From Swiss-Prot:
Gene name in the database record: rpl4
Listed name of the protein: Large ribosomal subunit protein uL4
Source species of the chain: Methanococcus maripaludis (strain C5 / ATCC BAA-1333)
Family of the protein in this entry: Belongs to the universal ribosomal protein uL4 family.
GO CC field: ribonucleoprotein complex; ribosome
GO BP, one annotated term: translation
Assembly notes: Part of the 50S ribosomal subunit.
Sequence intervals crossing the membrane: none
């Protein structure tokens, strides 16, 4: 299957043959598993001190005194038990807990292929909430000169020429302050995702693009399901460079 390649000003440059991965069957179940696997891989095991709450000289006086048989200090205050001040936790976190959702290598690769194919289906992209009115084609492939851009304004001009700016504005308007403790822990804002830019190799356009609201930039070799289907929802609006298409063809 061939698609149009567009210049930085939005004009057509020519055609490019898409890799066979863009014709992969849509498997939302596999995509969900792969994304959850990537998310849980970031979790760190946690546990408590094995002797937390146990460092006390409190003793139980046994039965027959008309009071609960909890361990007590010399002053008569309860200790050691979960309901006592300074006592142990009832069910503390265990480092042995399995946090990571495992997935087979072939399943993970199949999920990525399915997510890539879903990004080329207008109905799925639109259902995800992206603004695709006026976007020339899906998948959207741009001239390799895009990777040489050094200014965010230059990238934004390309987005305007390809009618991607509306999706960036939608993401910018959707930035909200979170409720609760997250504000105090370095994750104050909820930021919607907009355009994903896939480039061939590390280039200047990475720094130029990532300052736009909701825009993520990734190289073709580092692309995974978590980038192209964030939140387990496939169909992210994606801008590919010519070099990225060639690299993807080599991965599958």
């Amino acid at each position: 299957m061939n698609v149009k390649v567009y210049n930085l000003d939005g004009s057509e440059k020519g055609d490019i043959e898409l890799p066979a991965v863009f014709e992969t069957e849509y498997r939302p179940d596999l995509i969900k598993r792969a994304v959850i696997s990537s998310l849980t891989a970031k979790l760190q095991p946690k546990g408590c001190d094995a002797f937390a709450g146990y460092r006390t000289s409190a003793k139980s006086i046994g039965k027959g005194h008309g009071k609960a048989r909890v361990r007590r200090t010399a002053q008569g205050a309860g200790a050691f038990v979960p309901q006592a001040v300074g006592g142990r936790r009832a069910h503390p976190p265990k480092v042995e807990k399995i946090l990571f959702e495992r997935i087979n290598k072939k399943e993970k690769l199949k999920a990525l292929a399915s997510a890539i194919a879903a990004s080329a289906i207008p109905e799925i992209v639109s259902a995800r909430g992206h603004k695709i009115e006026g976007v020339p084609s899906l998948p959207l492939v741009v001239n390799a000169e895009f990777e040489g851009l050094v200014k965010t304004k230059e990238v934004l001009d390309v987005f305007k020429a390809l009618n991607l700016a509306a999706d960036v504005e939608k993401a910018k308007d959707g930035i909200k302050i979170k409720a609760g403790r997250a504000k105090l822990r370095g994750r104050k804002y909820k930021k919607p995702r907009s355009v994903l830019v896939v480039v061939g190799d590390a280039c200047e356009a990475i720094a130029a693009s990532r300052n736009l609201a909701g825009v993520d930039v990734i190289t073709a070799n580092d692309l995974s399901a978590i980038h192209i289907a964030p939140g387990t929802m496939a169909g992210r609006l994606t801008l590919w460079t010519e070099n990225a298409i060639e690299k993807i063809n080599g991965r599958f």
